[in-house]
């Protein structure tokens, strides 16, 4: 009975991809890969399984979100929870040279366990890039501009990119709060976009009215270059001023790339990915309640693999991207040749000729069809090769 109960069920958070959605994913994948390669990035693949002690702990994904298992030697493994940490491992061990910035790309599924069924997948596909070895703001501008180019190539014309700097947030919190423990509480409110909770917590802190106002003013630091001047007035530390200057340089570069119209500053932007060290960003689209992609600078991650190097990159969620584009049946037009046994050779010859021309063709024996009317609805056209030659129907 228990076996029958789960006959059609899937593990928590897992999804099937039906033909029409698979075809749409394939087209999005192909289009984006072509654009990424035009920018000089090279694709890489990494194992689905990684060691927990290395990639698992470096990934910045909460431990309870990891799928863990043991190999036959007793080592703890994880299904990769993201692609940045595995690529950092490969780059640090086999590819990266100090004098040579590295441009890598990926298209892979990642895995994050769900505690309950809330509509979020435990396995999802990401497409993204990593630019390793370039610590300049120009590298951040490049990956953001590439991300915008990819979205436009797949037909997403309306999107917005929120850009912030984790160094700025950390500098402001350290100035006012004095320790990491108190700062982490406020960062969590910001990550969860719980601005009501943030305001209430700030008002409960034993701070002067001036410092409370500084923390509350952080939420209003949004928009264009004018927000940078307001941000600089809010902090006094060198780290905070430098972070604001980096954002100013980023906006100038993005204007040159022609994507500044889609970019808006959000100085309160915080990520759950703890390895981000500088500029970070999220991209949003209409009709989608979550970011369809995110990225940022992670200058300390490769040091965990004993090869310090600056790096930046992004990942786009394919499922959310397709939701933003709008699901449409993009299966190519398929033709079907229905044949009887005596016309088999003729049917095979016709199918091979059409396939050689790039057409998609199905060969189907007439006796294998239960309902010819229902079956024919699946195809653009039907060619019938039935009976003796000379008695075709279409």
Swiss-Prot record:
Keyword hit for Cytoplasm: yes
Subcellular location: Cytoplasm
Gene3D superfamilies: 3.40.50.12590, Bira Bifunctional Protein, Domain 2
Primary site of residence: cytoplasm
Record keyword Phosphoprotein present: no
Gene Ontology biological-process annotations: histidyl-tRNA aminoacylation; L-histidine biosynthetic process
Sorted UniProt keywords: Amino-acid biosynthesis, Cytoplasm, Histidine biosynthesis
GO annotation, cellular component aspect: cytoplasm
InterPro entries to which the protein is assigned, alphabetical: aa-tRNA-synth_II, aa-tRNA-synth_II/BPL/LPL, HisRS-like_core, HisRS/HisZ, HisZ, HisZ-C
Pathway noted in the entry: Amino-acid biosynthesis; L-histidine biosynthesis; L-histidine from 5-phospho-alpha-D-ribose 1-diphosphate: step 1/9
MF terms in GO: catalytic activity, acting on a protein; histidine-tRNA ligase activity; transferase activity
Further details from the record: This function is generally fulfilled by the C-terminal part of HisG, which is missing in some bacteria such as this one.
Task of the protein: Required for the first step of histidine biosynthesis. May allow the feedback regulation of ATP phosphoribosyltransferase activity by histidine.
Subunit-structure text: Heteromultimer composed of HisG and HisZ subunits.
Family: Belongs to the class-II aminoacyl-tRNA synthetase family. HisZ subfamily.
Name of the protein this chain belongs to: ATP phosphoribosyltransferase regulatory subunit
Organism: Geobacillus thermodenitrificans (strain NG80-2)
High-level lineage: Bacteria, Bacillati, Bacillota, Bacilli, Bacillales
Gene from which this protein is expressed: hisZ
């Amino acid at each position: 009975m228990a076996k029958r109960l789960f006959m059609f069920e899937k593990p928590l958070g897992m999804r099937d991809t039906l033909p029409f959605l698979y075809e749409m994913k394939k087209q999005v994948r192909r289009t984006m890969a072509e654009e990424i390669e035009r920018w000089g990035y090279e694709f890489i693949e990494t194992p689905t399984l990684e060691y927990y002690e290395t990639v698992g702990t470096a990934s910045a994904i909460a431990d309870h979100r990891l799928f863990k298992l043991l190999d036959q030697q007793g080592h703890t493994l994880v299904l990769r929870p993201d692609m940045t940490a595995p690529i950092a491992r490969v780059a640090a061990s086999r590819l990266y040279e100090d004098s040579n910035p590295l441009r890598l790309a990926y298209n892979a599924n990642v895995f994050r366990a769900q505690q309950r069924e809330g509509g979020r997948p435990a396995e999802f596909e990401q497409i993204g890039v990593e630019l390793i070895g370039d610590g300049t703001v120009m590298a951040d501008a490049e990956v953001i501009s590439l991300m915008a180019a990819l979205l436009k190539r797949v037909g997403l014309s309306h999107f917005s990119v929120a850009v912030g700097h984790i160094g700025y947030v950390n500098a402001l919190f350290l100035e006012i709060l004095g320790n990491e423990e108190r700062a982490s509480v406020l960062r969590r409110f910001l990550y969860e976009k719980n601005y009501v909770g943030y305001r209430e917590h700030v008002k409960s802190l034993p701070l002067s009215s001036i410092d409370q106002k500084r923390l509350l003013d952080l939420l209003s630091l949004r928009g264009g270059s004018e927000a940078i001047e307001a941000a600089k007035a809010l902090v006094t530390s060198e780290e905070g001023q430098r972070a604001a200057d980096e954002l100013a340089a980023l906006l100038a570069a993005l204007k040159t790339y022609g994507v500044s119209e889609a970019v808006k500053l959000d100085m309160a932007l915080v990520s759950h990915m703890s390895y981000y060290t500088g500029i970070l960003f999220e991209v949003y689209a209409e009709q989608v309640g979550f970011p369809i992609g995110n990225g940022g600078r992670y200058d300390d991650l490769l040091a965990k693999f004993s090869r310090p190097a600056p790096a930046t990159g992004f990942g786009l969620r394919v499922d959310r991207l397709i939701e933003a584009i709008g699901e449409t049946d993009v299966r190519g037009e398929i033709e079907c040749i229905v044949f009887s046994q005596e016309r088999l050779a003729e049917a095979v010859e016709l199918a091979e000729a059409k396939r050689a021309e790039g057409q998609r063709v199905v060969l189907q024996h007439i006796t294998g069809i239960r309902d010819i009317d229902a079956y024919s609805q699946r195809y653009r056209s039907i060619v019938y090769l039935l009976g003796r030659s000379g008695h075709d129907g279409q």
